Each structure stands twice: as structure tokens, then as C-alpha cells.
């Protein structure tokens, strides 16, 4: 089994811009999927924020992202696990109403992670909010796995180039892991055992 980690995709970014859709289509068609096939990858772990808009979906964005991304995953036989990010959820402090679950249920090989789970030898943790904060902290405390995938807002990391985040969770909470891979911040960065993947574009 070979795994590909994919950061925030934000389908529908910039007011559902056609230019951005074309750019994304080129990336997935010319770079991403050919690289997966060449390397024999069969699983994708997507680290949150599949869609950009929290409140609704633009039908053009849905049609386009299905055509150049989700349909390809299904057709080529990849399995994808996507954990919920803050842009995927309707309510600010709960994950129960979310766009990936509502929009992608027809894809049997795409699995949406709404609560902390163990995937092989790794913890997979969705966006932390008031509703699941206790559950997530207890899950981390009890974990014996070396790896963690999440969508974390951590203090001391760059939100964008040169702009440091001063809010959110202290990274020491994740110190027990050998390696943590996270979505959320769009700038790639690496500090200690924590790596932010950044956006793929």
C-alpha cells in the first residue's frame, strides 16, 4: 500500500473562479494523477477543506470538481480518506452538517472522517471545535500510534508566508507523535515533529 498526502484543495476558491478551476484541472490532470499512477499509489489522505465555501455549494464548482477530481478517483480505483476541515462544516462549533458528507456519499471509495479514527498505524483527526474538543484530547492522550494526520490550528506556525499564528492549540499537545502532518495553513512549514503540507497548487 502506498499513500499520498494531499493538503487543502478548496474547490470553489475565489468565488468559484473559472480561471482557478482550469488551473486546478491542469494540476490534477497533468501532475497529480499521473504521479500517483507512476509511483503505484493506491490511497489518498486529504487533510481537510475539500470545498472552499462553508454555507453553500456552487453547482459549477460541484460539476467541475467531480469531473476532474472525484470521478477520476472513482474511475482509477483510488481510495480516499478526507478528514473534515473548518471550511467543510456549516456550523462553527460542530461537524455534523458538512459539505463532503452531503455531496460525496455516492462515491463508495471516498470516506469522510468526522471523528477521530485509527487508520493503519496513524491517528486521523478532523477539525477541533467546542463540540469535539474533549473527545479529541482524550483520543490523543490514549493514543500509542506514531503518526497523526489532522487539520490543526497550532500556535507558532505560519498561516501564510511571514505571518505567524498566535491562536489555537499549543503544539506540545502533539509532542507524543513521531510525525504529525496537518492541513489548514496554506504555507508549507516544518517545525519539530509537525509538518504543514500547505496547498498543493
Where in the sequence are the language-model features?
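N-terminal active-site segment of His-dependent metallophosphoesterases
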Residues: 1-67, 136-145
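Active-site glycine-centered loops adjacent to acidic/histidine catalytic or metal-binding residues
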Residues: 8, 48-49, 85-86, 151, ...
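Metal-dependent catalytic neighborhoods of phosphoester/phosphodiester hydrolases
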Residues: 15-17, 48-69, 84-107, 167, ...
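A short helix->loop->beta-strand "cap" motif at the edges of active sites that frequently abuts
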Residues: 75-80, 176-178
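Active-site regions of enzymes building and remodeling cell-envelope glycoconjugates
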Residues: 108-111, 121-122, 145-146, 162, ...
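Binuclear metal-dependent hydrolase catalytic cores centered on His/Asp/Glu-rich metal-binding motifs
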Residues: 116-172
Amino acid at each position: 500500500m502506498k499513500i499520498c498526502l494531499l493538503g487543502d484543495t478548496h474547490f470553489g476558491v475565489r468565488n468559484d473562479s473559472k480561471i482557478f478551476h482550469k488551473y486546478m484541472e491542469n494540476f490534477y490532470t497533468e501532475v497529480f494523477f499521473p504521479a500517483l499512477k507512476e509511483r503505484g499509489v493506491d490511497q489518498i489522505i486529504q487533510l481537510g477543506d475539500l470545498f472552499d465555501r462553508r454555507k453553500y455549494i456552487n453547482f459549477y464548482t460541484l460539476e467541475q470538481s467531480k469531473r476532474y477530481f472525484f470521478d477520476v478517483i472513482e474511475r482509477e480505483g483510488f481510495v480516499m480518506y478526507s478528514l473534515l476541515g473548518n471550511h467543510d462544516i456549516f456550523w462553527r462549533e460542530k461537524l455534523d452538517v458538512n459539505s463532503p458528507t452531503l455531496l460525496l456519499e455516492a462515491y463508495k471509495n471516498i470516506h469522510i472522517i468526522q471523528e477521530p479514527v485509527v487508520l493503519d498505524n496513524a491517528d486521523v483527526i478532523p477539525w477541533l471545535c467546542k463540540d469535539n474538543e474533549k473527545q479529541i484530547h482524550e483520543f490523543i492522550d490514549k493514543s500509542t500510534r506514531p503518526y497523526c494526520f489532522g487539520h490543526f490550528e497550532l500556535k507558532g506556525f505560519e498561516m501564510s508566508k511571514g505571518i505567524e499564528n498566535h491562536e489555537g492549540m499549543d503544539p506540545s499537545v502533539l509532542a507524543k507523535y513521531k510525525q504529525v502532518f496537518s492541513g489548514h495553513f496554506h504555507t508549507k512549514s516544518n517545525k519539530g515533529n509537525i509538518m504543514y503540507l500547505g496547498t498543493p497548487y
